[in-house]
Regions:
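Thiamine diphosphate
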Residues: 1-149
């Protein structure tokens, strides 16, 4: 999916955006609806960041917003771990996120949601979600990496 005009990419720059993406996608989709724009909104979000505003999935599902969330599941708050290193505060508790059932939670809020393990599964689910008239959450397992600050 390539941006093909103005208002196609909405980003939050800087380190003050953790937790912003789930709700921002809802806002963009609602604004599109008000303007008569028909398109899928894509939210690319980390599993840690998603925890800050996961309840926005309920809003998206209730309004039948055409949002495709791709949630990268690395089982940790990578950005917060990087900040801990930067601030020389090692061993901060609570930054590992094992066992999150993001797809299960999303289904509970009323979204279509799947866990994918392969690139092929991701591609198929993403293509299907782009044509859906509801909110889809695709959870992709990724490897933890040090976040860039």
């Amino acid at each position: 999916v390539a941006p093909d005009g103005p208002d196609r990419i909405v980003l939050r720059h800087g380190q003050r955006g953790i937790g912003w993406g789930v709700s921002a996608a809802v806002g963009v989709a609602l604004a599109d609806r008000d303007r008569g724009v028909s398109r899928a909104v894509i939210g690319l979000i980390g599993d840690g960041s998603a925890q800050y505003s996961v309840q926005a999935l309920w809003t998206a599902a209730q309004h039948k917003l055409p949002i495709v969330y791709v949630v990268m599941r690395n089982n940790e708050y990578s950005i917060l771990k990087s900040f801990a290193v930067l601030e020389e505060t090692p061993g901060v508790p609570g930054l590992d996120l094992p066992g999150l059932g993001i797809a299960t939670l999303a289904r509970g809020w009323g979204c279509h949601a799947v866990d994918v393990e392969t690139t092929e599964e991701l591609e198929q689910e993403f293509k299907t979600a782009l044509g859906a008239d509801t909110t889809t959450v695709i959870v992709v397992r990724t490897q933890p990496e040090k976040a860039m600050l």
